[in-house]
Amino acid sequence: YPKRTITYDNRLDFTKVKTLNFEEPDLKIFPCLGLAYEALAEGDSSCIVLNGANEVAVNLFLSERIRFTEIYDIVANTLEKHIKTDINDLDDVFEVDAWSRKIAMEMYNKR
């Protein structure tokens, strides 16, 4: 993972692209995108939790301690435990981020 197509020129030249087509993403195929939409709807602290938990889960995956599909489980379970809080300053951001990382690691250790 991921399966990648070999390309010989990695740059996208927008002056040569005639059209770009966008479709609604399939949230069954991309469930973490659904979590991001939910976090955006809930507000600031949820977005911070999503980010912190995702960073922990991705690092666990990259270090081969979890499967790719477990990223979703860790992030979703961390978000589920989160109680929305107001973010008033940078200290609040750091506090919520630290909490999310701690809970994400707890989720990993419980599995």
Feature map (PLM): residue ranges:
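Catalytic, metal-anchored helix/loop core of enzyme active sites in primary metabolism
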Residues: 1-111
